[in-house]
Amino acid sequence: LWELTKRAKEAVLPQVYIEDLREELKAGNRSMFSRRLKELIKDRLNKGEQIMLFLNRRGYAGFVSCRSCGHVMECPHCDISMTYHRDGRLRCHYCGYEQPMLKVCPECGSPYIGTFGLGTQKVEAALYKEFPQAKVLRMDMDTTKRKNSHEQILSAFSDGEADILVGTQMIVKGHDFANVTLVGVLAADLSLHANDYRAGERTFQLSLIHI
């Protein structure tokens, strides 16, 4: 058995922090960003260094539910929860079906419909609110539909046209940005609940790529 006991070219392992947002909530922090992450982002922005934030879910909110009866809005074709996007539409990320955001619950007629969870769109909006001076790029399926848009976003970030790059797993593989000194994996345990017996392994792989 051959073991890798050190990194290639004697590369230094980065400092890794794991934050429990349940403890953050108890401390009064209701943000999607831990207090440590916010301080680290501020530090990098002040130094002129770049940041990458990874969340493996696009859209604005992970699902839409009725606050009265608990009904979750699902795709009529796939029977999975639909994702809310900032353009006011619900989309199925499996088959592509979409519809306008509902005003009343189809099960009980209640007008109390809420969005829950988070996606890359919500992260982008939160960054602009928390760090208004920062320039943010978002890279996911929604921002890379046009020809060459994938390369344009990466090139712009590499050239220093943005301080923070937010994206799904397409931002984590095969990229090397010299000025990136901070990487945040948001809701790192999200993929543990995927319908996949290798969910734990895949979650570890995605997290390890950043390190």
Predicted features and spans:
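Inter-lobe coupling/hinge segments of SF2-like helicase ATPases
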Residues: 1-208
